[in-house]
């Protein structure tokens, strides 16, 4: 987090939720009670704002996938989804991104790519979904 960003947040009265999982569709929704409580993807920032949260951080989770991954493609896809949501939600959303220990070269390339995109939050790491 840059010093300028930190200074703008500290003392501003802003509340940051550091552990969210924004989503584009139901397959990426991670709520425990999705059958009873489901927000449309675009409602998330509004719902958080109503709770007093002005900035939310986190990665997109592929809840449709469970088990070992045969390639890095799906990891890259959810990282791309986080970039898309950053465009949609603007400064209210700080995206996080995934890496995968079975794909070290690809993960290092992804760290470099996301850094070029201005994304510096690595996580959440999800061995329980990505099979490691």
Each model region followed by its residue ranges:
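Active-site gating/metal-coordination segments in enzymes
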Residues: 72-132
């Amino acid at each position: 987090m840059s010093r300028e960003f930190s200074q703008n947040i500290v003392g501003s009265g802003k509340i940051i939720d550091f552990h969210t999982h924004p989503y584009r569709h139901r397959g990426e929704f991670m709520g425990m009670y999705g059958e009873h409580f489901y927000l449309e993807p675009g409602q998330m920032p509004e719902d958080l704002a109503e709770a007093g949260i002005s900035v939310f951080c986190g990665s997109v989770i592929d809840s449709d996938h469970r088990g070992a991954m045969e390639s890095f493609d799906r990891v890259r896809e959810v990282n791309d989804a986080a970039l898309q949501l950053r465009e949609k939600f603007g400064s209210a959303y700080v995206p996080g991104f995934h890496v995968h220990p079975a794909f070290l070269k690809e993960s290092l390339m992804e760290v470099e790519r996301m850094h070029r995109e201005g994304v510096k939050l690595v996580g959440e790491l999800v061995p329980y979904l990505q099979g490691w």
